Amino acid sequence: MEAPAPSLTEEDLTEVKKDALENLRVYLCEKIIAERHFDHLRAKKILSREDTEEISCRTSSRKRAGKLLDYLQENPKGLDTLVESIRREKTQNFLIQKITDEVLKLRNIKLEHLKGLKCSSCEPFAAGATNNLSRSNSDESNFSEKQRPSTVIYHPEGESSTAPFFSTESSLNLPVLEVGRLENSSFSSASLPRPGDPGAPPLPPDLRLEEGGSCGNSSEMFLPLRSRALSRQ
């Protein structure tokens, strides 16, 4: 679908007519007789009485025409009203063709300029939209990359494990591990041979002497009890 052709606003048309009068100033100053157009321009409120008196003060016809063009350039309808006045006079219709050609030429130049501005403004927009899309994709990928390592922590040894809020399984297994450790410790303590049992390692000499002394003393302590019991019998 093609974009609509650009159109000129009232402000653009006013500028085009003003430029046309400026471009044709030298030519119109030689051809126009200002006094012939006073009545029509005053009737259309383009000129006032003071304006016509100001124009008439000029010493030559060319200067009076130049001053008239100055007033016409200040009014958006000045050129159109001048063309109407020339058409009413019916003596300088060639001026109408000259003015019309100049206005059309400047109008086309203005349209081409606006068309070029519109095309140039569309291209950066499309490129900017592509850049924004790629930038958003890169931002999303960067965000996902940042989110990925946030759930992993590293131990000093370099081993990785899940973050605390993902360690429910390990916390649930803690009691089982503790029970296993207790069972293993009790089993190991029960299975070890006691001193003096078969398979137990020999005691050091110092401990042997102490054990022997304690046994001798204990037998001596029980001897009187046995003798008393035997004497009573």
Curated annotation (Swiss-Prot):
Cross-referenced Pfam families: CARD
Region (Disordered) location: 130-149, 186-233
Keywords: Acetylation, Adaptive immunity, Apoptosis, Cytoplasm, Immunity, Innate immunity, Isopeptide bond, Membrane, Phosphoprotein, Tumor suppressor, Ubl conjugation
Taxonomic superkingdom: Eukaryota
PTM sites of type Phosphoserine: S138
SUPFAM superfamilies, alphabetized: DEATH domain
Record-annotated site: Cleavage: R228, A229
InterPro entries linked: BCL10/E10 (IPR033238), CARD (IPR001315), CARD_BCL10 (IPR042143), DEATH-like_dom_sf (IPR011029)
Gene Ontology BP term (one): immunoglobulin mediated immune response
Gene3D superfamilies: Death Domain, Fas
Polar residues: bias regions: 130-141
Keyword Ubl conjugation found: yes
A Gene Ontology cellular-component term: nucleus
Ranges of biased composition (kind: Pro residues): 195-205
Residues found modified as N-acetylmethionine: M1
Domain (CARD): residue spans on this chain: 13-101
Covalent link location (Glycyl lysine isopeptide (Lys-Gly) (interchain with G-Cter in ubiquitin)): K17, K31, K63
N-terminal signal peptide: none
Modification after translation: Phosphorylated. Phosphorylation results in dissociation from TRAF2 and binding to BIRC2/c-IAP2. Phosphorylated by IKBKB/IKKB.
UniProt-recorded Gene Ontology molecular function terms: CARD domain binding; general transcription initiation factor binding; identical protein binding; kinase activator activity; NF-kappaB binding; protease binding; protein kinase B binding; protein-containing complex binding
Coiled-coil annotated residue ranges, if any: none
UniProt subcellular location: Cytoplasm, Perinuclear region; Membrane raft
Function of the protein: Plays a key role in both adaptive and innate immune signaling by bridging CARD domain-containing proteins to immune activation. Acts by channeling adaptive and innate immune signaling downstream of CARD domain-containing proteins CARD9, CARD11 and CARD14 to activate NF-kappa-B and MAP kinase p38 (MAPK11, MAPK12, MAPK13 and/or MAPK14) pathways which stimulate expression of genes encoding pro-inflammatory cytokines and chemokines.
Subunit text: Homomultimer; homooligomerized following recruitment by CARD domain-containing proteins that form a nucleating helical template that recruits BCL10 via CARD-CARD interaction. Self-associates by CARD-CARD interaction and interacts with other CARD-proteins such as CARD9, CARD10, CARD11 and CARD14. Forms a complex with CARD14 and MALT1; resulting in the formation of a CBM (CARD14-BCL10-MALT1) complex. Forms a complex with CARD11 and MALT1; resulting in the formation of a CBM (CARD11-BCL10-MALT1) complex.
Protein's name according to its UniProt entry: B-cell lymphoma/leukemia 10
Organism in which the protein naturally occurs: Rattus norvegicus
Gene: Bcl10
